Amino acid sequence: MTELRQRVAHEPVAPPEDKESESEAKVDGETASDSESRAESAPLPVSADDTPEVLNRALSNLSSRWKNWWVRGILTLAMIAFFFIIIYLGPMVLMIIVMCVQIKCFHEIITIGYNVYHSYDLPWFRTLSWYFLLCVNYFFYGETVTDYFFTLVQREEPLRILSKYHRFISFTLYLIGFCMFVLSLVKKHYRLQFYMFGWTHVTLLIVVTQSHLVIHNLFEGMIWFIVPISCVICNDIMAYMFGFFFGRTPLIKLSPKKTWEGFIGGFFATVVFGLLLSYVMSGYRCFVCPVEYNNDTNSFTVDCEPSDLFRLQEYNIPGVIQSVIGWKTVRMYPFQIHSIALSTFASLIGPFGGFFASGFKRAFKIKDFANTIPGHGGIMDRFDCQYLMATFVNVYIASFIRGPNPSKLIQQFLTLRPDQQLHIFNTLRSHLIDKGMLTSTTEDE
């Protein structure tokens, strides 16, 4: 007994802080594991039949397969008609529509996370998500306004100040949101709150960044906006039609209804469609000219002298093809060659944006992101491929098309001090004289 007392007396006793931290870690670990298991069993949003009653009655005698065909077809035509209307209304309306689509897509993705974890009553989750959306939009679109509305910004004192300190203001706004998130952390929900913090930021990266690139593409000329979007739409429709009538071979497990027949048929149909649409649009200045802001009329203008990219040129046809079609040359716009790259990406790589979205939906056991469009799902279901396409088009323009922009260089020049402007003027004049574009007589005058 004496021995036992001595052994107990000599055993080290763990400090209370360690015990407390261990129990805290245990509680946190149990909470995280419980969160994951509860998330698996939590009720998830499912797709509902929101087909208009008129269509339901008209198609009641058809099988579910053909009913879905007609519902998708009719509503697709309606969306295409709406697309034509907003194109007719001009670039300003297009930009507003892009912003609305961005907000709706963000709402659909954030709502999925909220529905999965709604039972945990996470503090400030939705408020902070929308606040971060506001911050990121302010950062991206503030840069755009400064680039494309420079004269207007410099004319108005408040806008000039906001433009000058734009990045600092953006960073400050984000820091406020970051501090709010840290202050909202709750002991029993640490891991889950960081999950949702990452969820929000990945959503912002996918949705806001891509929509920002869409608007940049639009400013390069409406043709860079319309052709890529139309190619994705065409590929989606033609892949569905080829798959519906000829589909036999499954393409990918993530989307069991996708077939190789639809994938290949959609590719060839999209390339042909891209060539035809590019040929038609390249002949109109309103589509090919960059969208610029006119300070005199306070409106957008799309009038310019078309670049060589949109002027008909004659190309020699390879000898092998000459023997088949009997033509030696063909007249086409250089942009049509670029349209082949755009349509190829839209049909071969673009669908992987849809496959990515399918994997996301399978992970959360939902059929669609929302029920906004009957037969199609949510807005995000229609734009999952468009966002990937927007990034490609922006990179393609920057790599192969865009050169130095004289108007932007002049804008930057005008912001310099007078002595800096004079120095650049003298340097440029000396350079032009050396090149033989100015004479010494001109210099003396």
From Swiss-Prot:
Modified residues (Phosphothreonine): T31, T51
Source lineage: Eukaryota, Metazoa, Chordata, Craniata, Vertebrata
GO cellular component: endoplasmic reticulum; endoplasmic reticulum membrane; membrane; mitochondrial inner membrane
Organism encoding this protein: Homo sapiens (Human)
Main location: endoplasmic reticulum
A GO BP annotation: lipid droplet formation
Domain of life: Eukaryota
Pathway linked to the protein: Phospholipid metabolism; CDP-diacylglycerol biosynthesis; CDP-diacylglycerol from sn-glycerol 3-phosphate: step 3/3
Protein name as it appears in the record: Phosphatidate cytidylyltransferase 2
Membrane topology: Multi-pass membrane protein
Keyword Transmembrane on entry: yes
Region of interest (Disordered), residue spans: 1-49
Expression sites (tissue/organ): Widely expressed. Expressed in heart, brain and retina, and to a lesser extent in placenta, lung, liver, skeletal muscle, kidney and pancreas.
Keywords: Endoplasmic reticulum, Lipid biosynthesis, Lipid metabolism, Membrane, Nucleotidyltransferase, Phospholipid biosynthesis, Phospholipid metabolism, Phosphoprotein, Transferase, Transmembrane, Transmembrane helix
Family to which the UniProt record says this protein belongs: Belongs to the CDS family.
